[in-house]
Amino acid sequence: MSGSSGTPYLGSKISLISKAQIRYEGILYTIDTDNSTVALAKVRSFGTEDRPTDRPAPPREEIYEYIIFRGSDIKDITVCEPPKAQHTLPQDPAIVQSSLGSASASPFQPHVPYSPFRGMAPYGPLAASSLLSQQYAASLGLGAGFPSIPVGKSPMVEQAVQTGSADNLNAKKLLPGKGTTGTQLNGRQAQPSSKTASDVVQPAAVQAQGQVNDENRRPQRRRSGNRRTRNRSRGQNRPTNVKENTIKFEGDFDFESANAQFNREELDKEFKKKLNFKDDKAEKGEEKDLAVVTQSAEAPAEEDLLGPNCYYDKSKSFFDNISSELKTSSRRTTWAEERKLNTETFGVSGRFLRGRSSRGGFRGGRGNGTTRRNPTSHRAGTGRV
């Protein structure tokens, strides 16, 4: 790095060339010797600028809020402009913290305390709480007290270009580890403190992590609470696994073969023939024998083929000839046969679960205030009045 040894580099305008032959210009903000990184603020990329490289890059007009460079990939660093002189407090090691007013002459200190590194928590030493954002102007004023940067001692490499708004960035605290009693510029006397920058940063980070953990635990508590309220109600019984006889269908239903059995044309012909036969008998006045009457009573299936017009004959009898199971079979159907018939006709019915429609069902849960509508119905047959 070029420049004299007595030049305060913090706040200076730096020209940085990476090993990719890309030149950047920005304001030197922090130097992290532990991670071998350099942070520049208000950075602009000028591209490769006719330097020999396999991948030439054009210049860019965007101004990045900050860029963090890693040590081993930086080729050259040049100080373009030193920081402007600031009228600040004398370099007193007793000063722990100071705050400048809104009329500060620093070009990087607006009316509101500002720091371009407020959202850099993943970089460790560069992350700090919002109280440390006021140290930017103070660090520029105390820049002469920082040791000069020797050439070649801090290898720096371009790590990544990270863009971000100024409201989401944190500043690094550039104070010595030991602190004593100090004063602030607003006239109040500060209390003695021996906390370092890391001591101030760690409680904020631990508190933020604790808030995140609490937010993650709240949905789990709500879900567990819902489970407790569901299991406490007495009326909601768990449905038992009842094995029911399911009907197995083998293959699809053949509608063509079923319709072939019912030939309407042949049925209509037989129906007309029987109607004509009855009309002839009525005209001739022939009386039916008893054998014919008994035969017609024993064979109701033949009369059923006559169609809907012959189901009821007023002159013959008051009752109709509609087929009934009571006439065809003397045995009464059992409950299982009736259930099977209903299943074949209407399909399998769904299971009825108790206690799903209301809280606690008929019995009611704890404290739901449900009462029985007819309490005397359970006393039937006991002999009480």
Curated annotation (Swiss-Prot):
The entry's keywords: Acetylation, Cytoplasm, Developmental protein, Differentiation, Isopeptide bond, Meiosis, Methylation, Oogenesis, Phosphoprotein, Ribonucleoprotein, Translation regulation, Ubl conjugation
Motif FFD box: chain residues: 310-326
Residues forming coiled coils: none
Segments forming domain DFDF: 241-277
InterPro entries the record matches: DFDF, FDF_dom, FFD_box, Lsm14-like_N, LSM_dom_sf, Sm, TFG_box
GO biological process, one term: regulation of translation
Region (Disordered): 164-246, 357-385
UniProt modified residues of type Omega-N-methylarginine: R351
GO cellular component terms, semicolon-separated: cytoplasmic ribonucleoprotein granule; ribonucleoprotein complex
Record-linked CDD domains: LSm14_N
UniProt feature, compositional bias: Basic residues: 219-235
Motif (TFG box): 330-350
Any one GO molecular function term: mRNA binding
Segments of skewed composition (Low complexity): 197-212
Localisation: Cytoplasm, Cytoplasmic ribonucleoprotein granule
Modified residues (N-acetylserine): S2
Residue pairs linked by disulfide bridges in the UniProt entry: none
Sequence positions bearing Phosphoserine: S106, S115, S154, S165, S329, S349
Composition skew (Polar residues), residue ranges: 181-196
Record text on subunit structure and interactions: Component of a ribonucleoprotein (RNP) complex. Interacts with DDX6.
Function: mRNA-binding protein essential for female fertility, oocyte meiotic maturation and the assembly of MARDO (mitochondria-associated ribonucleoprotein domain), a membraneless compartment that stores maternal mRNAs in oocytes. Ensures the proper accumulation and clearance of mRNAs essential for oocyte meiotic maturation and the normal progression from Meiosis I to Meiosis II in oocytes. Promotes the translation of some oogenesis-related mRNAs. Regulates the expression and/or localization of some key P-body proteins in oocytes. Essential for the assembly of the primordial follicle in the ovary.
Protein family: Belongs to the LSM14 family.
UniProt xrefs under PANTHER family: PROTEIN LSM14 HOMOLOG B, SCD6 PROTEIN-RELATED
Protein name: Protein LSM14 homolog B
Gene for this chain: LSM14B
